[in-house]
Amino acid sequence: MKFGIVVSEWNFNITGALLNGAVNTLKKHGVKDENILVKTVPGSFELTFGANQMMENCDVDAIIAIGCVIKGDTPHFDYVCMGATQGITELNATGDIPVIYGLITTNTMEQAEDRAGGKLGNKGDECAISAIKMIDFVWSLNK
């Protein structure tokens, strides 16, 4: 199994923790370093482009898209969340490999921290497990 991870640089204190959770979980499941490709994009809105480029140009079986958007005082939050979500959904509907949705959308930094290794666990771990399961699913159909 080969994995691509596209991670947003924005809110990297959160996305970095999610990335570490995903990578550590993949390694716990026997995935070697050389089978994990990590690339960064500036923000969560760029996750779709990054995942699409990875899908087209890299030898991976699944992609994990990791980002974090925290609500502010303007509607920017809604546009970024909607755009990234629709983009990842489109890639899953039209692409040949699964793209796992690892976008954390919260009202506060504390809520994000809770989901990035805090009291609610690490959503990066869950994304890695989903990626493994989706590869197994695809491979089961191709046998």
From Swiss-Prot:
Entry annotation: catalytic residues: H76 (proton donor)
Gene Ontology molecular-function annotations: 6,7-dimethyl-8-ribityllumazine synthase activity
GO CC terms: cytoplasm; cytosol; riboflavin synthase complex
Spans through the membrane: none
Organism whose genome encodes this protein: Bacteroides thetaiotaomicron (strain ATCC 29148 / DSM 2079 / JCM 5827 / CCUG 10774 / NCTC 10582 / VPI-5482 / E50)
EC number: 2.5.1.78
Protein name: 6,7-dimethyl-8-ribityllumazine synthase
Residues the record lists as binding 5-amino-6-(D-ribitylamino)uracil: W10, S44, F45, E46, C68, V69, I70, Y101
